[in-house]
Amino acid sequence: MDINLFDFHLPEELIAQVPLEERETSRLMVLDRETGDIEHKHFTDILSYLHEGDCLVLNETKVMPARLQGVKEDTGAHIEVLLLKQEEGDKWETLVKPAKRVKEGTVISFGEGKLKATCTGTADQGGRQLEFSYDGIFYEILDELGEMPLPPYIKETLEDRDRYQTVYAKEIGSAAAPTAGLHFTEELLEKLKQKGVELAFITLHVGLGTFRPVSADTIEEHHMHAEYYHMSEETAALLNRVKENGGRIITVGTTSTRTLETIATDHDGKLCAASGWTDIFMYPGYEFKAIDGLITNFHLPKSTLIMLVSAFANRDNVLHAYNEAVKEKYRFFSFGDAMFVASHAKMGNK
């Protein structure tokens, strides 16, 4: 399948550079995955579309301040490091810039030597393996020295780093935020619970795949970078109970979707407690096994994320919705507006 089938025209001014002042004031496009019908709403209207007995699945990963500015110890040359994945102990898979300056044995110093890293080898597709040394607690030092790893299309400085975290972020380990969750406030989640909507939590640590465009000409040639996921017995039991009682499972974001679909694929359609690494790649032709609806942001042209949404809601429906979003001047990408995708039969207000 040609990658260009997932292209669309996006004016640069529609790429949201900063978060809205209030999380829940973003807009919400409601897309019927079967008919392609569209409604234009506000995010707080999600209350009208989720019913008693439904379950929202939220990714409680927490973004690390994973971007570090350092210098080579021998020359003083500036090096930028992006932490991607903890491999074991103090060894990490990273992206470094400029990569050509970092070879095996190179030592990089951060914060006047408070944190040091030695390159121990190369990683996939141009990355570097670094081993860190320090006195104290690594994540406390990272919190002091690191910057939030905003995507390259965001040029503005983030004034409040909490705005690139969900309000329920808990398990540190991501190199990017699960952005569909950024729209929820604690008050909105409480209103959903009062309505009888269940909240279930999983973890998927967002890694390298988020920053890597599809370089292949056809979808089938592209390989996803593996990301760590975890679902507890408690969450699995809740999801199975919801399904047995006829409720819908609505994933918040592509990361929650990938977690549930990975587990269902690996366990004959069943949802159970599981941990591991997933490189699942969903594009048109994929048959969904676990979810009934999806809340997601508006994604980049030709990205694996728009392919996932197209697998769930039909490519023609999704591209029509995206063109409508451009026409209506929705805000795109990480700090942008949201889309709720589900089937018409259960879409309306109750």
Curated annotation (Swiss-Prot):
Q: Transmembrane ranges?
A: none
Main EC class the enzyme belongs to: transferase
Under the cellular component aspect of Gene Ontology, which terms does the record hold?
A: cytoplasm
- Keyword S-adenosyl-L-methionine found: yes
Pathway per its UniProt entry is: tRNA modification; tRNA-queuosine biosynthesis
What InterPro entries does its record include? QueA, QueA_dom1, QueA_dom2, QueA_sf
Q: Where in the cell is it found?
A: Cytoplasm
Q: What is its EC number?
A: 2.4.99.17
Q: Please report the name of this protein according to its UniProt entry.
A: S-adenosylmethionine:tRNA ribosyltransferase-isomerase
The organism is: Bacillus cereus (strain ZK / E33L)
